[in-house]
């Protein structure tokens, strides 16, 4: 069975294309970055002795970068400019008797740097008693220069660098956890699943101490079995386009080949410098998690990554189900609205246009995305009550008489009655719109003669959107108005029928609304 047929989709690693082939080399280089150690002492001989004692020193296969300064003032400049100082060996007495102590206070309190390890070295212990200094200053050790032999100095560095490494890891995990929490609080659709899945993947690789390039994608087989729809939903690499089709395009050839092998063979593979996990859920949706690394994964590491795949896959499935249900409800709303419009001998394009006008006006008005989306999806039902109005009135070509007009106004009441049977948020907003979109800003509307801000914003927005579209459309009782006539009418009804701000927004963005109308002709 042939599984893959890739088109000319967007490059997944567009900005990283030239670097991608050298992924392993970049990882090795990353592991060789030196540990930055700041030497602060006004005695140049101490710098020379320290450098000699630390010749050839390495921790976790990373060398040292020794930065020498001769005063507390110089040290302040270095600490303010660099955030990668792992350890500072600080003399207590320099340009002043307490210059070293002042530097410690500056680093901890003004710079708020809690990660750098600080060790005081003094040749005059009486100037700064150890007990008082340890108690009052946030330092990690206190040494007399005479006691720091070569071996003890190297032992000190192992201890301090190990502590710095662990603090950095904890900080990374805290940041990663905050991303996970932030993302998980908003996992409501497949787009927000990206941030959630990526945050968890970053957190996981951090916990496992992997200098890894990882990405996670799902592949859905198409009915014709000739290709698959694959989407990348998580990655640890920067500048990567997420959630695009043809996710393997732009990746190094060996990575593409491995992912395709795993998907076609439906099995997890260990490639030595990369591990590619495979999973298939109950719906036949395949998932691939690619993790490139420099060290071998332990059995626990693999288990954690497999758990990640399972849970993200389950979340993805649940989110897709939720999205499917939401889209189904939208379709039902539009189908019902189209049926009402068809009975009124108006096209279904009217409710679609009104919905888009409402969404754009809501955004321009400054409403939240969720509120704008709700108004957009509820507005098609603004005239649902017309199903209860006799055809003789709905289709009358001329002007309605007083009795007919009173009956026509009843469609608001009928619409509220129909929509009130559901307690769902969408239906409640639709009820609000049906009840108020014929109210007017000056209080002369119907059915309740509401005025100004007493009219819900959903009703105010739908009112102007409905009239704007109706004026430009051919109806049984009128020909379409010209754009100039519509503009003049909106200006005339500013502060009377419509909220002034909404009129101004529509006129300021006139071309956008005309473009919407043109995109959905009757």
Curated annotation (Swiss-Prot):
One GO-annotated biological process of the protein: cyclic nucleotide catabolic process
Modified-residue entries (4-aspartylphosphate), positions: 91
EC top class named in words: hydrolase
Catalytic function, reaction form: 3',3'-cGAMP + H2O = 5'-pApG-3' + H(+)
Binding annotation for a divalent metal cation 2: 383, 411, 437-438
Keywords from the UniProt entry: Hydrolase, Manganese, Metal-binding, Phosphoprotein
Residues in HD-GYP domain copies: 325-522
Pfam families: DUF3369, HD_5
Keyword Manganese: yes
Domain Response regulatory as annotated: residue spans: 36-160
Disulfide topology: none
Cofactor(s) in the UniProt record: Mn(2+)
pH dependence (UniProt free text): Optimum pH is 9.0-11.0.
Keyword Manganese annotated: yes
Disruption phenotype: Significant increase in the ability to colonize the small intestine compared to the wild-type strain. No defect in biofilm formation. Enforced DncV expression in mutant cells lacking this gene causes an enhanced inhibition of chemotaxis. The double mutant lacking both VC_A0681 and VC_A0210 shows enhanced bacterial infectivity, and the triple one (VC_A0681, VC_A0210 and VC_A0931) has the highest infectivity, which demonstrates that V-cGAPs play non-redundant roles in cGAMP degradation.
Binding site for a divalent metal cation 1: 382-383, 466
The protein's Enzyme Commission number: 3.1.4.-
GO terms for MF: cyclic-nucleotide phosphodiesterase activity; metal ion binding
UniProt name for this protein: 3'3'-cGAMP-specific phosphodiesterase 2
